[in-house]
Structures are given as C-alpha cells and as structure tokens.
Curated annotation (Swiss-Prot):
Pfam families linked: PCRF, RF-1
Keyword Protein biosynthesis: yes
Protein name per UniProt: Peptide chain release factor 1
InterPro entries linked: PCRF (IPR005139), Pep_chain_release_fac_I (IPR000352), Pep_chain_release_fac_I_sf (IPR045853), Prokaryotic/Mito_RF (IPR050057), RF-1 (IPR004373)
Organism (species): Delftia acidovorans (strain DSM 14801 / SPH-1)
Taxonomic placement: Bacteria, Pseudomonadati, Pseudomonadota, Betaproteobacteria, Burkholderiales
Length: 360
C-alpha cells in the first residue's frame, strides 16, 4: 500500500475514537441536527476504519506465514496462507482506495432528467421519446420511481421536451454522466429511400435541491403565466387555464408544467423544476471554472458536449468520452444501461484516484 493512503487511513482510526466520544456526550445527544450529522460521519468512518483494520490483520497474517516458510513441516500450510492473504490484500486495497475517494453530497439526491429534441426535426423528437422510455425502463428495473414533471409532445409522437423526476437511492450519482449531447443514426420511419439520417437530443441531469439549500425565489423576479394545456399537435385538451409557465426574469430561465390536474399542482411542479435549473446553472458555472484548470476525462456535462452515438444499423452504442463501444443497442434502448453506467463510474473513480495521488 502506498504511504499516502496509509497515512490517510491512520487518520480515520483516530477520527473514529473522536466520534465515539462525541456521540456519548449529552449536549450532542440533545441536539438532534448535530447528532444526525455526527452519526452519518460515524457510519462512513466506521466502514473505512473497519476495512483498514482487516487490511492490517491480513498484513500481520502474511508476515507470520512468511516466517513459517523456513519450517519444513509448516511450509505447505504457509504457502496456502500466503496466497490467501495476498489475494485478499489486493481486494482490500482496491476497496479502501474507492472508499477514500471524495464524495459529492449531491450524489445521494433524487434528480430531474431533462430531454430536449435538437437537430433533426421530427426524428429528433421521436428519439427524445425513445430516450425517455429507455431511462424510464432502467429506473423501473432498479426500483426507482419516475414522475413526468412536464412534457411538450411533437405531432408525430415523441417529445420536443420532457422533464422527468427520478426518486430513489443515489439517483443523481448514478445518472449524472448522462448529461450532454446524444446522437442517433438510423433510418427514420418516414424515410422512403432507406437512407440513414443523423439527429440529436440533449440531456441534462440535475440534482433535486435540498430544502435547506434550495435557492430562494423572490416573487418580484418571477413572471407566472397560465394557459390551456395542449396535447400533440397543439390541440387543447381542457377548457381551463390550468397549465403554468414560470419565467425567472433575471436569468430568462423558464419552466412550465401542464400535466397536473390543477393550476396549483402545475405551479408547484414548475417552481420545483425552476429551482433545480437555477441551482444547476450555478453548479455549471462553478464547475466550468474548475474545468478550466483541469480537463476531466468524462467532461463537464455541458449539454453541448457530444457524449454518445446510437447507431441502429450496426446495433452499436459508442460513448466517446471513455471510448466505450458495445453491440447490444436494442437491449440498451429497453433500459439495460447498467454496463454503460458502470463503465462511466469506473472511469470517474480512476480519474479521482489519479487526482488523489497527484495531490499527495
């Protein structure tokens, strides 16, 4: 194990003793907010300290087995123990490196998934619908709950824009690298010559704001419009102005909702989406400054970055950020995204580990 990792892990053992003492104090037990915060840190530190204790134990076992090699009667047993200890130490070191990686507190949050049709007209809108279906099926498969916050349908099906709210465990951390430009190459249903067309959609994944950290909206900064909800092709689907559009005047950011049963419900949903978009704007600006100092492998998550190509004639999906190509596109479009998300997460962890080594 590298020295800088061992030094960090030693600090976790010391911190665990401090946290055990803090959790025993009456003043902290009486402050529920502080007690919960310390309890969360205690759980994280306990996991790391426990694995490090196991690592040290296996190092001691390895040293003892190596000492036994000189005894002819014990040599065979010692060889078995050495092989077992070395294999487990490799596994433990890999696990500890991952546990030490910096965590983004937003990773545990629910998320808003915004899909917009881009270049390609009707075909782009159809592909936006396919992406929404792909993500919804994946969420269903992993036990996440999906709610449509707003949807602007196109005449031939699909969406000009759709916003989904995804609720579950570690949603944002798992889906965050889906942000960017998604390009599709296929023969559209309306194509009579059999020619392959290229179109594109953009995806933005935004963490749902925490109530304590949500941006406070000044009513004077908002313009709230009501209008009749409409379906595909623009036809009105009710006779009351229940749909709501909220404009944040200082930034020009807009959110609208027409899927709820009442104007009150639609306004509440539109304000939720607006808060998420404003928070994401702040986050993007902050990360853009950091990205100017270092260019990450996976990219900034900017919706203008082309991140992935879906080639239907070849049954191929290519993620350009990590040079990943897989030939099971139909399964992916049915929601089988696990391999892609795992590869992106592994690339990000490798990137963070490299930064950790440089900084130490």
């Amino acid at each position: 194990m590298q020295d800088f990792l061992r030094q960090q892990l030693e600090r976790y053992a010391q911190r665990l003793e401090e946290l055990n003492f803090l959790l025993s104090r009456e003043d902290i037990m009486g402050d529920m907010k502080q007690y919960r915060a310390i309890s969360r840190e205690h759980a994280d530190v306990t996991a790391i300290a426990g694995r490090y204790a196991r690592h040290r134990q296996r190092e001691a076992d390895l040293a003892a087995a190596q000492d036994m090699l000189s005894d002819p009667d014990m040599a065979d047993m010692a060889q078995e123990e050495i092989a077992s200890a070395e294999a487990e130490l490799v596994q433990l070191e890999d696990e500890l490196q991952r546990l030490l990686l910096p965590k983004d507190p937003d990773d545990a949050r629910n998320a808003y998934l915004e899909i917009r049709a881009g270049t390609g007209g009707d075909e782009s809108a159809l592909f936006a619908g396919d992406l929404a279906r792909m993500y919804t099926r994946h969420c269903d498969a992993v036990g996440w709950k999906v709610e449509i916050m707003s949807a602007n349908e196109s005449e031939l099906g699909g969406y000009k824009e759709v916003v989904l709210r995804v609720e579950g465990t570690d949603v944002y951390g798992r889906l965050r690298f889906e942000s960017g430009g998604h390009r599709v190459q296929r023969v559209p249903a309306t194509e009579t010559q059999g020619r392959i067309h290229t179109s594109a959609c953009t995806v933005a994944v935004m963490p749902e704001p925490d109530e304590t950290q949500a941006i406070t909206l000044n009513p004077a900064d908002l313009r709230i419009d009501t209008f009749r909800a409409s379906g595909a092709g623009g036809q009105h689907i009710n006779k009351t102005d229940s749909a709501v559009r909220v404009v944040h005047l200082p930034t020009g950011i807009v959110a609208e909702c027409q899927d709820g049963r009442s104007q009150h419900s639609n306004k509440a949903k539109a304000l939720q989406v607006l808060q998420a978009r404003l928070q994401e704007k702040e986050r993007s600006e902050r990360e853009a400054k950091e990205a100017a100092l270092r260019k990450g492998l996976i990219g900034s998550g900017d919706r203008s970055d082309r991140i992935r190509t879906y080639n239907f004639p070849q049954g191929r999906l290519t993620d350009h950020r990590i040079n990943l190509t897989i030939y099971k596109l139909l399964a992916v479009m049915e929601g089988d995204l696990g391999d892609v998300l795992d590869a992106l997460q592994a690339a990000r962890e490798a990137e963070l580990l490299a930064e950790l080594q440089v900084n130490n």
